[in-house]
């Protein structure tokens, strides 16, 4: 006969929703078998009880056998073979129904006993195991719930031991009960065939014995058919016995192997933490807020599917989307005095979930898995190898290198295969300066023991006025474009360039140099290494607004400006050469009251887009600002030239007016002189007028030369 559908006993300890769904199918099949066998039992019982109704009962039996093919068994894998067999039985029984007599003893032994035994023993055993399993499952859920509520701050060894022992006992009981329940359901598939065929075989044998003299109704073909059925029943029984023995052995092996797993927090030395996972599944407690200060915790089955975190409640056929974890952030948190809690925040910061793992191993594996998925490692050809390589790079970044060259070759693609002098050829416009920079020590770039700031200072902090002063006045004093003081707000609003990017702040630290991109690379390495050492996963998300005047970090929820970086103070910016989502820039500000005391701070960010786009946007803003400044200078120069020309024009007009007045005065003097005056008087008047005219002419020439 075809293969028998079986429940996987090996998956009973995991107790996943898929296993529970498959169990529901088997339970539905057992219910269908029970209903059908009850009808068949009633039909055969009528044969046994009532001699007078034997014919009618036989006819009903034949009818039920014919209707077997119309039954819908969820696990009816061999319906065609069984239907054809029962159809043939139905025909024979229908032919013999008119001449059957009551043979109560033979029918009781050969027909009623097997089906009664199946009904009273096997089916009741299934019902009993189902009830026991349900009780064990409820006890296990209650024990897990009590264990999850253990206080981390007020830890009591006695209470913890009792709760842990309770979890161990309930989990062991549930596992053992579930394995035996699965075994009984698997065995039921064999017993179903036996319970169907063996009573029929006994019934026919009783009829053969009764009608031994009626050989005309019992030909050789029928005997051959019955013999084949008997052989099939024996084969099914032997197969069942072998399978039962195998399942019992599997149960024993699993009980021994699964004993350490009954503990909710297994020994980490025996079960090491795998940090290279890109897929994970298991039960987690999810925190759901029910009010302003109240919340509930629901235990659900969570699993990752690509870049999505899925959840599935017990009894559901399939899981549903819980959160998109691409580009998300995950970190361990303390929540309601519960252990092993972690928080997942979506890439846009609008959705977050707090989950609780069952053990420390699950807690760290979930955080590492979600962190790997957030980096989209699962999209590569070999996700686990890529995750292992990334984690190994993080560990190497934490380990100090003996030289500056070795520290930065790990950050450059193909850096290990190039000779040490290859860096000087890729320096671009820096020329020979990169050769000198390669020989510098680490202290020449970043001061030793420099503190790292992992969070953004709020605008309402006490340091903000001084910081604004450093960014504002200090930036204008060192402005390379020569901008004059003015309203920053109006300049930002009138800016030609407005580009907005979503970034997450990784950290900032003071640097000692700001003339080479290696400063940014080294700062990235130290900040990432510090985050890895201290297990800092939280990042502050902001909107980075790039304009022609400044860079602004804006709170995405309140739209409040967190920090403002004047564009002239941004003297250097670069992108990580391997992880293009990482970028940073160096800000040169006034470090104190003295304008000559300047300090440089390097800020590192992670973006959803490529960091090169943000750096290109900053470069474009600087170019636009430079051209705007050049245009402003040219405009001011042109205005100055026009003012000089206008002044000269006014002087010339004034000179012409003076000359015109002199000429008019001369005409008046000439007209007023009399021709009959004495020569001396005429000479005196003429000499006086000439002297006055000459004085005025000299004065006009002097003014003209001055103009």
From Swiss-Prot:
The keyword DNA repair does not apply. Residues 636-666, 698-707 have a biased composition (Basic and acidic residues). CDD domains: BAR-PH_APPL, BAR_APPL1, PTB_APPL. Residues 3-268 form the BAR domain. Expressed in insulin-target tissues including skeletal muscle, liver, fat, and brain. The modification Phosphoserine is found at residues 401, 410, 691, 694. A motif (F&H) lies at residues 403-414. The modification Phosphothreonine is found at residue 399. Residues 397-433, 466-490, 636-707 are annotated as: Disordered. Residues 234-257, 620-670 form a coiled coil. Multifunctional adapter protein that binds to various membrane receptors, nuclear factors and signaling proteins to regulate many processes, such as cell proliferation, immune response, endosomal trafficking and cell metabolism. Regulates signaling pathway leading to cell proliferation through interaction with RAB5A and subunits of the NuRD/MeCP1 complex. Functions as a positive regulator of innate immune response via activation of AKT1 signaling pathway by forming a complex with APPL1 and PIK3R1. Inhibits Fc-gamma receptor-mediated phagocytosis through PI3K/Akt signaling in macrophages. Homodimer. Binds RAB5A/Rab5 through an N-terminal domain. This interaction is essential for its recruitment to endosomal membranes as well as its role in cell proliferation. Binds DCC and the catalytic domain of the inactive form of AKT2 through its PID domain. Binds PIK3CA and subunits of the NuRD/MeCP1 complex. Interacts with OCRL and INPP5B. Interacts with NTRK2. Interacts with APPL2; interaction is independent of follicle stimulating hormone stimulation; interaction is decreased by adiponectin in a time-dependent manner. Forms a complex with APPL2 and RUVBL2. This is DCC-interacting protein 13-alpha. The lineage of its organism: Eukaryota, Metazoa, Chordata, Craniata, Vertebrata.
């Amino acid at each position: 006969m075809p293969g028998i559908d079986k429940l996987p006993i090996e998956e009973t300890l995991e107790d996943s929703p898929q296993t529970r769904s498959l169990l529901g199918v088997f339970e539905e099949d057992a219910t269908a078998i029970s209903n059908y066998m009850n009808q068949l039992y009633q039909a055969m019982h009528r044969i046994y009880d009532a001699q007078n109704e034997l014919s009618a009962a036989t006819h009903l039996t034949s009818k039920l056998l014919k209707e077997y093919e119309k039954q819908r068994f969820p696990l009816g894998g061999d319906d065609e073979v069984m239907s054809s067999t029962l159809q043939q039985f139905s025909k024979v029984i229908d032919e013999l129904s008119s001449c059957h007599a009551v043979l109560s003893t033979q029918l009781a032994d050969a027909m009623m006993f097997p089906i009664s035994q199946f009904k009273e023993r096997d089916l009741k055993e299934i019902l009993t195991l189902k009830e026991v399993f349900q009780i064990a499952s409820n006890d296990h859920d209650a024990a897990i719930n009590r264990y999850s509520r253990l206080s981390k701050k007020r830890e009591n060894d006695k209470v913890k031991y009792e709760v842990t022992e309770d979890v161990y006992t309930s989990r062991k009981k549930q596992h053992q009960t579930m394995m035996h329940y699965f075994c009984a359901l698997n065995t039921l598939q064999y017993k179903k065939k036996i319970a169907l065929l063996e009573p029929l075989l006994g019934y026919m044998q009783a009829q053969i014995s009764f009608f031994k003299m009626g050989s005309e109704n019992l030909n050789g073909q029928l005997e051959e058919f019955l013999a084949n059925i008997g052989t099939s029943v024996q084969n099914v029984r032997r197969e069942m016995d072998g399978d039962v023995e195998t399942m019992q052995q599997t149960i024993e092996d699993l009980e021994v192997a699964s004993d350490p797993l009954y503990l909710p927090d297994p020994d980490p030395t025996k079960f090491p933490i795998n940090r290279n996972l890109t897929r994970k599944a298991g039960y987690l407690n999810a925190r759901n807020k029910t009010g302003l200060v109240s919340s509930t915790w629901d235990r659900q089955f969570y699993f990752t599917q690509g870049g999505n975190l899925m959840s599935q409640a017990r009894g559901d056929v399939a899981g549903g989307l819980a959160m998109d974890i691409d580009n998300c952030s995950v970190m361990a948190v303390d929540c309601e005095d519960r252990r092993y809690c972690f928080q997942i925040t979506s890439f846009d910061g609008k959705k977050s979930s707090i989950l609780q793992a069952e053990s420390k191993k699950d807690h760290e594996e979930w955080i590492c898995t979600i962190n790997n998925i957030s980096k989209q490692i699962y999209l590569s050809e070999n996700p686990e190898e890529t995750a292992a390589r990334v984690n190994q790079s993080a560990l190497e970044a934490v380990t100090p290198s003996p030289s500056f060259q070795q520290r930065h070759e790990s950050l450059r693609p193909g850096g290990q295969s190039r000779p040490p002098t290859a860096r000087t050829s890729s320096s671009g416009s820096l020329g020979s300066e990169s050769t000198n920079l390669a020989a510098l020590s680490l202290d020449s770039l970043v001061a030793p023991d420099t503190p790292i700031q992992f969070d953004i200072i709020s605008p309402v902090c006490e340091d903000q006025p001084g910081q604004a002063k450093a960014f504002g006045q200090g930036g204008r004093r060192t402005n390379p474009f020569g901008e004059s003081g003015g309203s920053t707000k109006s300049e930002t609003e009138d800016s030609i360039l407005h580009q907005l990017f979503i970034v997450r702040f990784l950290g900032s630290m003071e640097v000692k140099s700001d003339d080479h991109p290696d400063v940014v690379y080294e700062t990235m390495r130290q900040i990432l290494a510090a985050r890895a050492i201290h297990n800092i996963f939280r990042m502050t998300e902001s909107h980075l607004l790039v304009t022609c005047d400044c860079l602004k970090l804006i709170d995405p929820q309140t739209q409040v400006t967190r920090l403002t970086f004047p564009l002239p103070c941004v003297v250097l910016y670069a992108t990580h050469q391997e992880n293009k989502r990482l970028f940073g820039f160096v800000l040169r500000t006034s470090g104190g009251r003295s304008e000559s005391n300047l300090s440089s701070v390097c800020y590192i960010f992670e973006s959803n887009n490529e960091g090169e786009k943000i750096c290109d946007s900053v470069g474009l803003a600087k170019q636009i600002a430079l051209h705007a400044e050049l245009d402003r200078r040219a405009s001011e120069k042109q205005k100055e030239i026009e003012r000089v020309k206008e002044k000269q024009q006014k002087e010339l007009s004034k000179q012409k007016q003076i000359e015109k007045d002199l000429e008019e005065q001369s005409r008046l003097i000439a007209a007023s002189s009399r021709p009959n005056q004495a020569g001396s008087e005429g000479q005196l008047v003429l000499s006086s007028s000439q002297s006055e005219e000459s004085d005025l002419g000299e004065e006009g020439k002097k003014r003209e030369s001055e103009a």
